[in-house]
Amino acid sequence: MEADPKVPFTDEMNIQDEHNWESGSWSSSRRSNDSNVTLLSRRSSVEQHEDERQKDSDTLFEHGDAALDAQGIADPRLKDYPIPLVAQTVHLRNDDSEPILTFRVWLLSTFWVLAGCSISTVYYFKPFSVRLSGYVVQLCTWKMGQLLASALPTRPFTVLGRRWTLNPGRWSAKEHALVVIAYWGSSYTAYGLGPLSAMELFYGKRLSSPWAITFLVTTQLTGYGLVGLYRHILVRPPSMYYPGILPTVSLFNAMHGDPRQTASSLRVFMAIASAAFVYQWLPSFVFPLLSSLPLLCWVGRGSWEAFVLGSGSLGFGLMDFSLDWNYVAFLSPLFTPLWANANRFVGAALAVWITYPVAYFSDALGSLRFPPMSSETFDTSGGLYNVSRIMTPSLELNQTALELYSTPRWSFSYAMHFFWGFASASAIVTYAVLFHGRTILKALANVWSLDGNTADDIDSEKDPYVKLTSHHARVPQAWYALLLAVCLCLGTIQLYAGDMQLPWWGLQLVVAISALFTLPCGMLFATANVQIGMDYVSEVLAGALFPGRPVAVLTATVYGRQVLEQCLNLASDLKLGFYMKIPEWELLVAQVYGTLLGPFVNWAVMRLIIDTQGAAALLGREGGDGKGQGLGLGQGGGGGGGGGGGGGQQQRAAGAHTTEWNALKTKNFFSSSVIWGVMGPARVFGGGDGSPSSSSPYRWLLPSGFAVGAAAVLLLWLIHKARPAWRVQQWPLHPAIIFHGASLFPVFPTTNLTSSMAAAVASMGVMRRWHPRWFARWNYLLGAGLDCGAQLVQMVLGLAFLVFNRHGQQMVRMPHWWGNDAVAVDQCFPPPDLPSVIMSPM
């Protein structure tokens, strides 16, 4: 990471501005520029600024790392900043003459949203996922912006009385950041596309385009309205710093700083990204054995117990290591705080390496009938659950068939996945109430009294970054409230116009509960880079409220999940804009634009695929009956910047199997609607009237999960009250994160765990503590480069599979050899006495 340490933090602030910053008084006339008019009138000031910057650079270029103190902080004004990671990364420079919402921003953001949404939607209906990496977009946009700055005409023109220019000058960091933020708004396929495709392909319910797009837009934008309510808690305080965006800030610094100071940073980043790109071909395609090195399985070869304990793909992954960055990056080890990853690791290790093996070998809940680490849904005989056997031709529940067949069964590990999920949900709310309740209530009580243009927020009065941008016009609370109200009104109208089976009060209730969870989840995400979502709660809640209405369950689940996630996405992007000194109005416009444009592309591409390919091609020979489909809840690769656990596995699977159309995600949504909507939580977790689930083995999961989560936090709080001198709040211990870490498996392969935690200790532990200068200069660039190179390989492989592996052909396929064994790619061969059920698909 490099935050331009050799440049003084006054090189882009004139002396009067620095004096005003010190005194805390800013002229009300200093407003952020919102058009290119200001830019045209400031040509001379920009040129003068460049001259001053050049003189400062000439003076300081010789000093190198001498500008960094022992903690890697360059500016003495930030030496006491409460978050050293931010002080090391985010500079105190701001140039209000830099262009912001320019023609180049609109052009490039439109291009990347169209390209990214089209690619992600096409692969939504493929057996593996591919999306444009955020780092790839950031890198390409940098050069494209520079090209436009040199090619577009600079002649001004007048439109509706306002002077404009296509080219206001050099490509600025603020423009660059806005393009990336707009792309982030739609970088993933809209979550609501799954229910829409499931409704059409399985339930024969096709929505008209206007109402379908309304559904996608409202599910994506409703959460943005909550940001106005929570931004004074989730964005403004310095303690809410969002660790996941610091690598992006570091890369922006390297791209837009003085070339003589950042040239070395860019060279290092490009070298790392290139090396990662070359190396990643080995574990992803040529030598996949590198992805999983199951030492215990190799040592105990021939023993089925050693196979179960040591396999990282089918078993518990004990002593399994990985040299695949897609797996190593699972915990985002180079920028997630070490204490947070330690909590996740403890929870995962206690679950995967202690609880699950003991329960499995003791046959708890009939574990030996099912694979040890599987997220599929089974029947009582151990076969994959066939939902078509319990459905009538009209896709309603056949109670008699259910009693004759089976209620759903899970592996012990997947049953505990729900237990840990319920525990983490209750723990995070309880923690926020007990430890931060007064602060939250005070902030919420004053939220409407805080003017949109003031910086007097909680814990931010003395924040130098706040003071630096306090003159920027901020979005009033009323605008966020208006956005929320419009989305709720349109969403309610769409429910009835589209016959979504969800009553108006159901939408309001789901949004209200999601809003309740958003604040504690957001506080954790902003400080620990750990996001606990509404997946578990929204599905169970919707199934309990609307039994027998699968479409209503799908609709409520989407709103419950997306309101929370989109609120946190915008809060994170607002913090990025805050670090990049982008006014809130401009950032909100860019974010909403990208998010609005995405659903139109998602729906258009989905319509093209369904209309041209047909349901039979998308659903395979099963013809849409959902036979053999498991829940698939919570599965998926990680995002840019360090998720991606399992990405290499997905690509290798794609290389070994057909890449024809296969709506796996849609099938998973259909199966979820059957389990939680048609059958309902009462039958799954017990207590259903007259159903065989009255003796369900999982009847204890929900109540005990919520109770354990709340009890763990309550115990911690009681210790805090009984022994104040112990400073419990400063302990690196968070029950919600521990439970969340345990819930990650078996959804993700256990291969991820050991190597990812080792990388976290090396980066955020050893290097940050013992080599802070190196950490401050290179750590985030290292992480960004590794992510960029590895993700680019996955994108290239995915596109190659799409283009060449069609119509049953396997033109892109690595020949089998010792490092790419046809039976066991990790050389963890199943012994002859291995129970056949263990080899069932995960």
From Swiss-Prot:
The chain crosses the membrane at residues 105-125, 177-197, 210-230, 268-288, 315-335, 345-365, 415-435, 478-498, 505-525, 585-605, 668-688, 700-720, 731-751, 784-804. Glycans are attached at residues 33, 36, 386, 398, 752. GO terms for biological process: protein transport. Keywords: Glycoprotein, Membrane, Peptide transport, Protein transport, Transmembrane, Transmembrane helix, Transport, Virulence. It holds the Pfam family OPT. Residues 23-36 have a biased composition (Low complexity). Residues 629-649 have a biased composition (Gly residues). GO terms for molecular function: oligopeptide transmembrane transporter activity. It is a multi-pass membrane protein. Residues 44-58 have a biased composition (Basic and acidic residues). Residues 1-58, 629-657 are annotated as: Disordered. PANTHER family: ISP4 LIKE PROTEIN. This is Oligopeptide transporter phomP2'. It comes from Diaporthe leptostromiformis (Lupinosis disease fungus). The gene is PhomP2'.
